[in-house]
């Protein structure tokens, strides 16, 4: 009985090596499934950075933090892309506009 089990294990290992040699991938069955209908989740819900770290006051002089929410062209990234909640997105927008007014951050560039 032990010999049969060891032979089966060796055969399985050989089969896996053959599959890898052919460039095929093994199927993965540990996918996250939706609890309601059993389908695969297509996106991961983003968590607000400020809510997670209990930040209530945003300083317009904190340029390093504000640059995370501004594109290279100078546009403010919308909340659906950066994952902030509505409350903190308003605070971020206000802080960015204040920083622009004082010339700490650039306005939009078209080039």
From Swiss-Prot:
Ribosomal protein listed as a keyword: yes
Gene Ontology cellular component annotations, sorted alphabetically: cytosolic small ribosomal subunit
Keyword annotations of the record: Ribonucleoprotein, Ribosomal protein, RNA-binding, rRNA-binding
Annotated spans, Disordered: 1-32
BP terms from Gene Ontology: translation
Domain of life: Bacteria
Purpose of the protein: Binds as a heterodimer with protein bS6 to the central domain of the 16S rRNA, where it helps stabilize the platform of the 30S subunit.
Protein name (record): Small ribosomal subunit protein bS18
Protein encoded by which gene: rpsR
């Amino acid at each position: 009985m032990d010999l049969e089990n060891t032979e089966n294990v060796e055969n399985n290992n050989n089969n896996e090596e053959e599959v890898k040699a052919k460039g095929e991938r093994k199927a993965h069955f540990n996918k996250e499934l939706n609890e309601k209908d059993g389908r695969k989740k297509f996106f991961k819900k983003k968590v607000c950075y400020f809510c997670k770290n209990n930040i209530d006051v945003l300083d317009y002089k904190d340029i390093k933090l504000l640059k995370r929410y501004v594109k290279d062209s100078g546009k403010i990234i919308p909340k659906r892309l950066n994952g902030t909640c509505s409350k903190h997105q308003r605070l971020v927008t206000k802080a960015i506009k204040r920083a622009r007014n004082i010339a700490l951050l650039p306005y939009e560039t078209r080039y």
